Amino acid sequence: MADVARARILYLHGFCSSPASWKARLLGERLATAGFADRFSCPTLPPVPLAAIACAENLLACAEGPTTLVGSSLGGYYATWLAERHDLRAVLINPAVMAPVLLGGLVGTHSNFHTGETFEFTAEHVAQLRALETPGVTPARYLLLVDSGDEVLDYRQALERYAGSRQIILEGGDHSFPRFPEFVPQIIEFCGL
């Protein structure tokens, strides 16, 4: 188990999302209530994939203790790449296993769900996602949480991709993973806090 005095959580939000996502806010609030507010980070990830990775890597480089990643949707895709590259653990919530394929169909103008800020998602960004594909994963690194009713992603891709990892599969639900509050204690425990 990680040293509780130093363990940290880095939350990576999904496409068109932000630190204002309800899951990020709830996790941050629960950690603050437990006295760990200073151990939680959720940056605003740029819509450009390589810039998002650079942002996360900068935070990892500054971390004073072991960091566990928590990634939702596209954030789960990023968390996988970072976990394998930097020997970290990660909690994945309805991860975008096939992000280049999924987002390849979304080239164009988008608005952030929380800020309303618009941005262009381009074919170059899809190529950057392809460059972040991770050929294999180390199952022991991961806690996977998926909803079978995810309307955006096929949850079975995640089950296959992270076979052998600790998996929580819920019937129904949707891409937002509405039962997230029930699993916050397990997430915090997995993260070593």
Per-region residue spans from a language model:
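The alpha/beta-hydrolase serine catalytic core
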Residues: L88-L193
